[in-house]
């Protein structure tokens, strides 16, 4: 696909005079364009749902969710992956973010990194990619060699693959088994795909990881019941989670959390089923960590 023919490289008529307007009008133009992004994502919800189901199936079988991208796309993958352990209590290696150019590229531009097909393959080899894993290639343009080569390598190993781009019919879309293509149109600043395209990618990644965690029993109602209390704010959140899930007092919630070494799931089952910490943990373990299943047990 030629660069000048890509939607993400097109000229946006709405912002053609943005350098001549007031600061407030500038913000309005950007905001008006941003409003279109959730609608673009809405149009690909069935594709996102299909990807979530595949990711959940693979992760349930011992696989990992691996994001692969360059520049903004790679940074968004790393951001999403890094939030999963504290939010959902999963091991750091379960959701992995890889970026062309390595760790240095998180904060700096690495010239030519996205053009390295070898880099995409080697980065996946270095984390021991297996057929159980799911590789999600992220590229707004859909033409990034680093990502395309990584998806091709993953396919050769038998991995399930997902491609996220913002240009229909792109190489990323056609290389991946599952294509998610929110078409957000031309950017306010021509070609600056960190803007609308990046926002769309972030919304999609939010859904992929959150959907995986919900289907894995990491959410009860809408509560993040596997949150790890790494600071005072999260200690308070744990108490509130147990309170909201059970209707108990803050004191009862804190007592239960202390007894079970601050595991919200265990504390909730303790309170609702009147069990001690060991009994509640055993009950949860017998039901795969799903609170609802544990509560349904007679």
UniProtKB/Swiss-Prot annotation:
Subunit structure: Homodimer.
Role played: Specifically catalyzes the cleavage of the D-lactyl ether substituent of MurNAc 6-phosphate, producing GlcNAc 6-phosphate and D-lactate. Together with AnmK, is also required for the utilization of anhydro-N-acetylmuramic acid (anhMurNAc) either imported from the medium or derived from its own cell wall murein, and thus plays a role in cell wall recycling.
SIS domain residues: 55-218
Note in the entry: A lyase-type mechanism (elimination/hydration) is suggested for the cleavage of the lactyl ether bond of MurNAc 6-phosphate, with the formation of an alpha,beta-unsaturated aldehyde intermediate with (E)-stereochemistry, followed by the syn addition of water to give product.
Induction line: Induced by MurNAc 6-phosphate that releases the repressor MurR from the DNA. Repressed by MurR in the absence of MurNAc 6-phosphate.
One biological process term in Gene Ontology: 1,6-anhydro-N-acetyl-beta-muramic acid catabolic process
InterPro entries, sorted: Etherase_MurQ (IPR005488), Glucokinase_regulatory_CS (IPR005486), MURQ/GCKR (IPR040190), SIS_dom (IPR001347), SIS_dom_sf (IPR046348)
CDD domains: SIS_Etherase
PANTHER family tied to this protein: GLUCOKINASE REGULATORY PROTEIN (PTHR10088:SF4)
Family matches, as SUPFAM superfamilies: SIS domain
Catalytic activity: N-acetyl-D-muramate 6-phosphate + H2O = N-acetyl-D-glucosamine 6-phosphate + (R)-lactate
Keywords of this entry: Carbohydrate metabolism, Lyase
Pathway: Amino-sugar metabolism; 1,6-anhydro-N-acetylmuramate degradation; Amino-sugar metabolism; N-acetylmuramate degradation; Cell wall biogenesis; peptidoglycan recycling
Organism, as annotated: Escherichia coli (strain SMS-3-5 / SECEC)
GO MF annotation, one: carbohydrate derivative binding
Record protein name field: N-acetylmuramic acid 6-phosphate etherase
Enzyme class: lyase
Family of the protein in this entry: Belongs to the GCKR-like family. MurNAc-6-P etherase subfamily.
Active site: 83 (proton donor), 114
Gene: murQ
Source superkingdom: Bacteria
């Amino acid at each position: 696909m030629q660069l000048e023919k890509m939607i993400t490289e097109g000229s946006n008529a709405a912002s053609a005079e943005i350098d001549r307007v007031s600061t407030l009008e500038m913000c309005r133009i950007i905001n008006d364009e941003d409003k279109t992004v959730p609608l673009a994502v809405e149009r690909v919800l069935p594709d996102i749902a299909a990807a979530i189901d595949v990711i959940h199936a693979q992760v349930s079988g011992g696989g990992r969710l691996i994001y692969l991208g360059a520049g903004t796309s790679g940074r968004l993958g790393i951001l999403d992956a890094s939030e999963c352990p504290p939010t959902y209590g999963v091991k750091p290696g379960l959701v992995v973010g890889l970026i062309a150019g390595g760790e240095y590229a998180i904060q700096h531009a690495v010239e030519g990194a996205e053009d390295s097909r070898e880099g995409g393959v080697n980065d996946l080899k270095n984390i021991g990619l297996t057929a159980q894993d799911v590789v999600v290639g992220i590229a707004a343009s859909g033409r990034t060699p680093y990502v395309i080569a990584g998806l091709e390598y993953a396919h050769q190993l038998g991995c399930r693959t997902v491609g996220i781009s913002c240009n229909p019919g792109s190489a990323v879309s056609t290389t991946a088994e599952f294509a998610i293509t929110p078409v957000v149109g031309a950017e306010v600043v021509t070609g600056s795909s960190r803007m609308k395209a990046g926002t769309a990618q972030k919304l999609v990644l939010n859904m992929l990881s959150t959907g995986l965690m919900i289907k894995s029993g990491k959410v009860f109602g809408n509560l993040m019941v596997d949150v790890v209390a790494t600071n005072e704010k999260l200690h308070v959140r744990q108490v509130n989670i147990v309170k909201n899930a059970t209707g108990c007092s803050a004191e009862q919630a804190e007592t239960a959390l202390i007894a079970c070494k601050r595991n919200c799931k265990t504390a909730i089952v303790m309170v609702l089923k009147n069990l001690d910490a060991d009994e509640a943990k055993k009950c949860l373990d017998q039901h795969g960590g799903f609170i609802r299943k544990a509560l349904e047990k007679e």
